[in-house]
Amino acid sequence: VQPEAEAPDRWRILAIVAVGVLLAMAPWFSASAVATPLAAEWRLDRLGLPTLTIAVQVGFAVGALALAMTAAADVLPARVLFAAGAVLAAAANAGFAFLATDLASAVPFRVATGLAIAGIYPVGLKLLAGWFRAERGLAIGVLVGALTVGSALPYLLRAVGVSQGLDWRATVGSASAAALLGGLLVFAAASRGPWDAPAPRFSLEIARSALREPAVRLANLGYLGHMWELYAMWTWVPLFLGASFAAAGASDPATASAAAFAVVASGGIGCVLAGAFADRLGRTTLTIAAMAVSGSSAIAAGFAFGAVPALTVAIAIVWGVTVVADSAQFSTAVSELAPAGTAGSALALQMALGFLLTGLTILAVGWLDPGDGSGWRIAFALLALGPAVGIVAMWRLRQRPEAVRMASGNR
């Protein structure tokens, strides 16, 4: 029996998986959301704080590769694997809040959180791939948007916690509760789609063969430029906003946390719009435009330090919308450009390298220790180097004859 042209339940499944991802991603930045009280209690310096986020990045990269190297995503139903990842992420995050007493004891819990989250987002993508064909670009855009809002969720939880006078552990505990709820939702309501197919096993040799293609290398370089900026921005913009508000004489931790949520979550809008229009505009056009605006916004945000909070937040929101809008386009480009049979391994390697790179820029900003306007201008100019390199890579990709394989010929 041939499946229908489009699965009738696809939008319901998209809503379930998107909400599940949004909730289950909450533990990721829970340490960044409580950076100020955590640093005071544990006496952390500016290198100690980013270490807690970098540990998650490393855990995720290792977990994503391990998932790709095994048949776990095919042996276990995707909804079961998703729920298991969410439960483990919630438990590890709770361990960080209620069992860890210093940086050394917290890092293993943060690494475990990243390992567990590797069973959430990639598995969510696999679930949706079984339900969508022609509209897969939009579905992936919605899912990346959900990941973005979920990454911002701890900042909203912190804003509520501060306004209620709650300890930082309440914020982290609430993020764990959100992850549990997201896992339960997907486990109870999601199901396998009519076009579900086994995921290809990861092979380093196959991935290397894909990288021999110049077009694949350029798409990967564009992705690395994008990742150079993205997660460092999400990690540090809350502290930047708090310091900027204080310099403007408007110090209020609850307002700063709420503003950080708005800035990071606004990227969800960019993801959905990019997912809807990428095939029409072309991947290189969209990625070049997004990186040009995000890189410019990074520099502008540094110069807006200490300005009227409304202006600083407005610039940061433009940055937030564009810094992640093009995220799904790089992986889609590799899937279109990689030789037959190599896309799965090429994408797994791309994701692992990208997330490992984020640790470098997150740490670099901490090492710069930007305490005032000049410090933040230098730090954000460093982040803007990523999109600058990405723009060059995607422009060179656009000139190559293989680029016609992307976005139905729209490059």
Residue ranges and their predicted role:
Residues 281-330:
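C-terminal transmembrane helical hairpin of 12-TM major facilitator-type secondary transporters
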Residues 176-197, 390-398:
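C-terminal membrane-cytosol helix-exit motif in multi-pass small-molecule transporters
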Residues 2-7, 193-221:
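Juxtamembrane intracellular "pre-TM" segments in multi-pass secondary transporters
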Residues 109-146:
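Cytoplasmic helix-loop-helix junction between adjacent transmembrane helices
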Residues 64-102, 278:
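Conserved MFS/SLC helix-loop-helix module at the cytosolic interface between two early adjacent transmembrane helices
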